[in-house]
From Swiss-Prot:
Gene3D superfamilies: Superoxide dismutase, copper/zinc binding domain. Transmembrane segments: none annotated. It comes from Drosophila madeirensis (Fruit fly). The lineage of its organism: Eukaryota, Metazoa, Ecdysozoa, Arthropoda, Hexapoda. The gene is Sod1. Keywords: Antioxidant, Copper, Cytoplasm, Metal-binding, Oxidoreductase, Zinc. Its EC number is 1.15.1.1. This is Superoxide dismutase [Cu-Zn]. InterPro entries: SOD-like_Cu/Zn_dom_sf, SOD_Cu/Zn_/chaperone, SOD_Cu/Zn_BS, SOD_Cu_Zn_dom. Homodimer.
Length: 114
């Protein structure tokens, strides 16, 4: 995507045991599926190169959002129409906004061509 995409995404979690609701929209995506992931570092000064790998504090394998064995940062794909904002609407029970495994302060990366 080369940094051409931009948008706003909200993460909401009522309690530490509740799922996280991810909502928002991304502009500038080409038509098709795009990976949507939380990366390890909150540094995006050099695009996704400085954000590190997918957030994976438990050393799991890369997987789909519904897989038991997956990186915490693996949130699946978003579908872009190519000519309008791309809606983000994800509910995830593995990521958290609380405690040692919190995603707060990390970078969200949208990958081209998932």
């Amino acid at each position: 995507i080369n940094g051409d995409a931009k948008g706003i995404v909200f993460f909401e979690q009522e309690t530490s045991e509740a799922p996280v609701k991810v909502t928002g929209e991304v502009l500038g995506l080409a038509k098709g599926l795009h990976g949507f992931h939380v990366h390890e570092f909150g540094d995006n000064t050099n695009g996704c190169m400085s954000s590190g790998p997918h957030y994976n504090p438990r050393n799991k394998e890369h997987g789909a959002p519904t897989d038991e064995n997956r990186h915490l940062g693996d949130l699946g794909n978003i579908q872009a129409a190519g000519d309008s904002p791309t809606a983000v609407s994800i509910t995830d029970s593995k990521i958290t906004l609380f405690g040692a495994d919190s995603i707060i302060g990390r970078t969200v990366v949208v990958h081209a061509d998932a």
